Amino acid sequence: MPVKIAQVEKCFKSAGPQPNGLQASADGLWCIDQRNNRLYRQDFATGEVLFDAQTDTVHSSGVTVGGGYVWVASTYERKIAQLEIDSGKTVAKYSSPGSGVVGWREGAADAQETGAHGLEWRDGRLYVASPPSQMVHVIDPEGWRETHCFRVPGLRVHGIAWAGDGNLWAADTSAGTVSLLDPHSGRIFDVIRVQAPDEVHGMTIHEGVLWYCSAANCDIGRLLLY
């Protein structure tokens, strides 16, 4: 099979110093920053900040919108925060599924437990990508119950995004790959490479094109295939 290498199109810089989660919506591009923990919404064309709010999350690594709320992965708190969509204020916090020590820190004396990264929403369920468990966990927010989980490829799963065919894109930041997965079995249908030094941290999809952000250099851009 041919190797698919994404052409990285850098669109604009993030509003915050370390963007780590991304979610496309009808009214703009949501971004959560892992350093200042601020929640932004930016214009797709210009990067203009349309919304800006301080959250009480900790070293956040994922964001999505669903059920009338914004959801943020508060990674170092090992929580998923449910926020008011018009203010960024916390409504509730829930235990982050799959929390633990990431594989590359296993056995280290100073290893710290952390939580989720990428988030997505579909059909009333929250999809939670967890680097410690190397899985995507499917959560029913009513009662905060895990209904399913499936393994994802790679060492460090990060952003996730729904493809138009109902499958799920998942980024592995350590390997520089984005894989297309069956959201029930985890079976891999396709793989895209993203060449260094570019890194995919947060990821989403808008008008059929994958968008990414990188905490390493504040880039927000698109992953194009020709």
PLM regions with names:
Residues 7-13, 48-53, 89-94, 98-109, ...:
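A short beta-strand motif characteristic of beta-propeller blades
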Residues 43-47, 84-88, 140-144, 182-186, ...:
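Short loop/turn segments that connect beta-strands within beta-propeller blades
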Residues 14-26, 56-66, 97-123, 153-165, ...:
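Beta-rich, blade/repeat-based domains predominating
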